[in-house]
Amino acid sequence: MSVRYARTQAEKLVERLGRNDTPVNVEMIAEHLGLPVVYAELGADVSGLLISDGTDAHICVQAKDAEVRQRFTIAHEIGHHHLRHQFEPGHHVHVDRGHYISERGPRASDGVDPKEVEANQFAACLLMPTKLVREKVAELGGGPLLDHHVSQLAGAFQVSEQAMTIRLSRLGLL
C-alpha cells in the first residue's frame, strides 16, 4: 500500500458517508464501520488500540488524552482497519488468545513504520478532508494564513494546531 492510497481511501470514506460538516464525527464513522469505541486508562505510552479477533473489532482509546488526541487516535485506528493492515506478532502488536491488538504507541508518529505512516495520513484526511479544509480556508477571506487562522481552523475541525499546520502544508495552503 502507499500513503497516497491511504489518503484516497479516507477521502472516499468521508464522501461515501456524506460527512460535509466540521468537525467530522469520527466516533460515528467508527460505529458505522462496526468499530465500537471504548475509553479506558491505558499504559502511559499507549494512545489507543485496535483489537480484533478476525471477525469483530473495536477501538480502545486512552481516556486521559486530550479530546483532539483521542479523535486522531480513533481516526488512526479506523485507518488500520479500513486499510486492512495485517499484523503479525511482534512490533506494536500483541497476540492474546487469538486476538490481535495493534497499539498506537510512541512509534506511531516517528515516520518509520509504513503501516503507521499510512494510518496517520488516513487519520489526517479523515479528520480534515481536502474539500472541507479548502472551503474553510476560503471562508477566511483568501489572504495569507496567519497563526490565528490556523488556530481557528484547528478549532473548527477539533484537531491540534500541529495537525492542522501539517495538513495545510501538505495541501499547499501554508
Can you annotate each of these PLM segments?
Residues M1-L174:
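Active-site hotspot residues in diverse enzymes, especially metal/ion-binding acidic/histidine motifs
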